[in-house]
Amino acid sequence: MGLDINILSVPRAVTTKPVDAYIGSRYDANPRWKQVLWWRNDWDLHDLLAMLYHKQGGTKENFNNTTVRLYKRDLRLFDASITAPILEHMKQGRVVYAESSF
């Protein structure tokens, strides 16, 4: 079972369609985005992927073939707290990283 996870930075949230997860916390209380899973603080990518995967019918403990898509223009906004876990999951074969302009 595979899953595409689309991630967007908060600065672009107001001008684009809803995605699976936003990086940042300024829109946490906005009901406009209530259908989106939030991660409010310094987040654990594994937990976020597992929760999204579980929503698609997979198990929280065992997920694979997950494609993480980011906006190319947002890459500079993401610090090591997001890029390092993505790279680690790539090494373990669970995540395929894909730059995207979806």
Name every feature range the model reports, one short phrase each:
Residues 1-102:
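Acidic (Asp/Glu-rich) sequence patches and key acidic residues
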